Amino acid sequence: MEMNIFDIRSFKGSPQAEYGGAFHVSLPEIGPDLKAMGFNLMSRANNHTLDWGLEGMRETSQVLDQSGIIHARAGENLAQAGAARFLETARGRVALLSLATSFTPMSRAGDPAGEAPGRPGLNALRLAQGIVVPPEKSRA
């Protein structure tokens, strides 16, 4: 889902300086409509998750929760943002994992560190570059 859901007329947050290219937003009434159209699962980790800051992220989560839509979500810390979400159906359980490969630098969720709380945000794909040298090439 590449938008935020909140009532722009009463929203207390603001658009962010770094954003995903457009300030997509919809009114909360879209939540029940999406559910009625058959949307049961939504991925939230994308370059628009924090276009409207933490307030937009949190209000969007609230609308989806109230509408009964499961979302592999951005969360209050990395554990929440990275957690799988599950939908139980008559035919079995469906799992949803969500991560982003394109995002603004401040969008990544983080783990708590000591007394510091976790950082709210999205589940970002974290890559580590490495070079593997075969043993036969590493001999001098």
Provide a role label for each language-model segment.
Residues 1-140:
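Acidic, metal/ion-coordinating pockets
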